[in-house]
Amino acid sequence: MEEQAFPNVFLIGEHSEYYAEISEQHPAILLTVFNNDMEFAFEKWAGMLVEMENFAKEINYDINGVKLFLHVYFNPDGKIKYLSYYPKPNSKNVPNAEITAFFKSFAKVYQLQVNADIGFQHYASASFPTFFGNINKETAKK
């Protein structure tokens, strides 16, 4: 795969010829990276979504009403290598170019607090606003 030609943010279903290679580069999953501690892994994921929401507020981007499937591929240091998404049918209508630009900007600045041995991935759905006000903020920052 040509690193330069392949986008780091794309719609799920696009570039399907590269999925096997991307998955090989990120063989672990979020849960195993956090020693199969479901609560801790969930708080890390929720913390990332809260950071996404905060980033949207910082740049004055209205993400509220957006509902989508996310597949995020992380480097071992927690930086986002690839992010693919697909809007849910009940999502607020947002142009793909706009949400792609948002995710590209977020991926440049975000780093999950983790020290993994290998790349890892997580696939889940997300809705904004998150309503994760009760997550343990200390866990999310660890």
Model-inferred region functions:
Residues 1-142:
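Charge-biased low-complexity segments
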